[in-house]
């Protein structure tokens, strides 16, 4: 029979990683049953505040002989009991088992958990309705992600190869040869991506926490991902690695909405007009976007670096499509900008001094009159309006790789502009 297994919320900022636990289990269970595919790393709503780190759950599906099912389930629960970081207050693991074909109701729940806010009670209700078996540890919030990862319709996917460290190295600086990463990236880009930040000359594949992950390599071609990994040199042993199928970098979290429909923790694409000039606070750039249903504050936060320069070029009246997640900032609902597309830009007018009507020379301001620097001709001070080029193009602007959310699709990948342009088609 088909047995689906979902696990979530076993990690904490202090260590552990649900993918590590998942990779160990996948290897162990494969001795007892036949995997139908790679294990799946499913990222859920990135805006939820009580996520442990990247809000990623792990699912896997096996063809299991009926008499082996209890042994497989016991193995999963044993591993979670042994390896989850129960000491952290935000770590509330959940495990879900489901037998047979995935019903539509479970798929719908998965997409809701990706795009909106879902409660533990909702997850329990759906699990009971579809006949899934669930186990809660502590508060058991992890059953939301565990159930959602099982039901997730992975129509668009990428790959991530995760290499893990030997336990004695956990919590120490990772030893990854940066030059080898740049060389590997040059060979494999864009089939693998977000390996490096070419502007800062930094590598992005190695996390910085105390967790077991040594590196994570992302790509759209599994062969290239594996070959790229072989090209990277390490100054410490690799314990083992696991290739995951994942919804990372798919933009599947984004759904078109009107501004008035936006709720806290939504991920959405909206179309609207910039209603007033941008302002800055603490290196963050803000502006207001409105449509016929309402207004929302939009933010390009400091970590987005140069992306903020493009946001600063927006003017009141500009019509744009904006994509991002809704959070609360300073008590105000705020769209955390991931991408934007200028649909219609208003003319930019600057007022300039005219040329000297007598000799064509440059006029200089002298109180309430203008005086020609060349011939001395004087005239009343009157500036003339001149339309100047806008410094924004009709293209999608995105945050840099090190500020990109796990789910956000880079423009370098096929379909990187799809969600934004769908909004253009829907409302244009």
Curated annotation (Swiss-Prot):
Its EC number is 6.3.4.22. GO terms for cellular component: cytoplasm. Pfam families: TiaS_FLD, TiaS_TCKD, tRNA_anti-codon, Zn_ribbon_TiaS. It catalyses: cytidine(34) in tRNA(Ile2) + agmatine + ATP + H2O = 2-agmatinylcytidine(34) in tRNA(Ile2) + AMP + 2 phosphate + 2 H(+). It comes from the Archaea. GO terms for molecular function: ATP binding; ligase activity, forming carbon-nitrogen bonds; nucleic acid binding. ATP-dependent agmatine transferase that catalyzes the formation of 2-agmatinylcytidine (agm2C) at the wobble position (C34) of tRNA(Ile2), converting the codon specificity from AUG to AUA. One of its GO terms (biological process) is tRNA wobble cytosine modification. It comes from Thermococcus gammatolerans (strain DSM 15229 / JCM 11827 / EJ3). The gene is tiaS. Belongs to the TiaS family. It is found in: Cytoplasm. Keywords: ATP-binding, Cytoplasm, Ligase, Nucleotide-binding, tRNA processing. This is tRNA(Ile2) 2-agmatinylcytidine synthetase TiaS. HAMAP family: tRNA_Ile2_agm2C_synt. It is an enzyme of class 6 (ligase).
């Amino acid at each position: 029979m088909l047995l689906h297994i979902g696990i979530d919320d076993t990690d904490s900022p202090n260590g552990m990683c649900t993918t590590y636990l998942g990779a160990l289990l996948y290897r162990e269970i494969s001795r007892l049953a036949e995997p139908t595919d790679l294990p799946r790393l499913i990222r859920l709503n990135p805006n939820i505040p009580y996520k442990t780190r990247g809000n990623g759950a792990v699912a896997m599906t096996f063809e299991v002989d009926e008499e082996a099912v209890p042994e497989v389930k016991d193995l999963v629960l044993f591993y979670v009991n042994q390896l989850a970081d129960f000491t952290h207050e935000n770590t509330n693991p959940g495990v879900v088992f489901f037998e047979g074909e995935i019903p539509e109701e479970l798929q719908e729940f998965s997409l809701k958990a990706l795009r909106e806010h879902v409660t533990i009670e909702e997850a329990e209700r759906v699990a009971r309705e579809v006949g899934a078996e669930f186990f809660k540890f502590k508060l058991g919030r992890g059953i939301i992600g565990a159930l959602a990862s099982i039901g997730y319709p992975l129509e668009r996917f990428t790959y991530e190869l995760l290499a893990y460290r030997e336990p004695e190295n956990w919590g120490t600086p990772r030893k990854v040869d940066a030059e080898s990463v740049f060389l590997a990236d040059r060979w494999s880009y864009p089939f693998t991506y977000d390996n490096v930040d070419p502007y800062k000359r930094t590598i992005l594949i190695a996390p910085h926490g105390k967790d077991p992950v040594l590196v994570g390599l992302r790509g759209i071609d599994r062969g290239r991902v594996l070959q790229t990994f072989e090209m990277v040199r390490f100054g410490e042993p690799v314990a083992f690695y696991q290739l995951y199928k994942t919804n990372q970098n798919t933009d599947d979290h984004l759904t078109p909405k009107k501004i008035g429909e936006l709720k806290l923790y939504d991920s959405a694409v909206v179309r609207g007009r910039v209603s007033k000039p941008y302002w800055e606070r603490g290196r963050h750039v803000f502006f207001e976007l409105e449509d016929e249903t309402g207004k929302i504050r939009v933010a390009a936060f400091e970590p987005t670096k140069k992306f903020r320069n493009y946001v600063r070029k927006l003017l009141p009246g500009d019509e744009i499509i904006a994509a991002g997640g809704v959070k609360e900032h300073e008590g105000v609902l705020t769209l955390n900008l991931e991408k934007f597309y200028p649909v219609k830009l208003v003319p930019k007018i600057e007022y300039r001094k005219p040329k000297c009507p007598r000799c064509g020379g440059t006029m200089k301001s002298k109180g309430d009159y203008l005086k020609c620097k060349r011939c001395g001709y004087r005239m009343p001070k009157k500036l003339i309006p001149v339309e100047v080029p806008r410094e924004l193009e009709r293209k999608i602007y995105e945050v840099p790789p090190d500020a990109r959310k796990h789910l956000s699709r880079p423009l370098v990948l096929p379909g990187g502009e799809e969600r934004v342009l769908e909004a253009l088609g829907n409302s244009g």
